[in-house]
Amino acid sequence: KFGVGFYSSFMVAKEIHIISKSWQKDSQAWLWKSKGESSYTIEETEKETRGTRIELFLKKEEKEFLEAQRLKHIILKHSKFVPFPIYLEGEKIERKEAIWTQPKSKLQEKVYADFYKFFENTQEEPETYLHLSSDAPVQFTALLFVPKTSFELLGLMKTEPGVDLYSKKILIQKGSKDIMPEYLRFVKGVIDSEEIPLNISRETIQNNVRIDKIKKHLLKKLLEHLEGIKSKNRAQYLNIWKNFSKNFKEGAVSDFENREKLSQLLLFSSSKTAAEQLTDLQEYVKRMPEGQKEIYYLGGTDRGTIEKNPALEIFRKKDFEVLYLLDPLDEFVLDHLREYDKKVFKMAESADIPLEEKGETGDAAYLKDAGNLVLYLKTVYGEQVQEVKISRRLTDSPCLLLNPADGPSVQMEKIMKMVNKDYQLGKRVLEINPGHALIKKMVALHKQDPALPLLKTLALQLLDNMKLREGILSDTEASIARIQQIMLEAGGPDDQVK
């Protein structure tokens, strides 16, 4: 009875001879011959020692398989973990013990590290490993490694899948694309199952029920392993996060079934953490004060820029924590997650956040005048903004631009603009702070004479200042000219200058 491995020999051989003799005393040796067609012959032959010898008569075009280096490459690729010695032209081929088949209790850390170095042909030890065995729902053993370094992070090409599929220690598929999800392509190691046939094809793997069960069980255990490191050894996890955070974010977007588990692996900078520290979503929720119903976030190029955003003023006043999204991918991830622990993610720059301070700012007469300024600003800005309104959330800044309900952030819009130059930025909501000195000055000027040129100049520059802060100011020359005009006005009439 021959397997697919033997029959594949006819792909390179025009004829195959098998000479075999039993260990039993005075047994007869036999010669089996076939050209790989529909028949074969068996006849008596001479052989002094017991055992089996297979002779391949190669086709003319397959002479490369007579080269020792070619044969050595094949042996090392497919059979470097077989339990018996292999010799090539009298030389014993180096092989490694399949340590994944051994009990974990008998293996030391150095054994795992040495195996990883051999397996990956590297001098670097792994960051962590996961060794597990399962008999149900399907039998398999696995040994997975997380590297210390991400080659993608170094700017090299996209990492190819690094988990090899074995059956009884024989390589079935190197770098299988079907055993681990795409976002975990950085994971290295082996999966071995006796229930996987040696002749399984790529198409069969994709539709194999056993493979699917292995994949689900293995992924569950690996994500739990990573979460365990995050909980017990944050310093080690921070190194994993530094190298593979984009992979976890990719998974949180693409893997709906495991999205909840992947959300546990995410880390963020925050208004409640030091500059060099990161927090996870579970820690954020634990710190939420009574009355806070949503998880707030704000994006920006760096922490310093975010902390200067006027949108944070109301959150500081109420002592509500805000996640700082420093990676352009972060907002995309939270948009797909939508919620965590039944708490919805909410952009701190959203115009519909119900955090405004109650009551009025100033006396009724002044607020009426401020309302008249709002009407004036709407006329000046026209289609540049969606709305102008009195703010109940600002404490220190004169104004801010907010996103309409469910609208994308300006950071997301800038990415869209980079992808599509014809993309039109959405209209924002401008809120003005009636308690700020600049707004009070503009209210007074409007009450004095709505037609004052300086008032319009201030109004246009007010909006430009917000656009400049957010990096969306398009007409810088006009803005500079306005600033110069304001500076001249501040200097007094020309006849006072000597």
Residue ranges and their predicted role:
Residues 1-7, 11, 15-498:
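Conserved GHKL (Bergerat-fold) ATPase module
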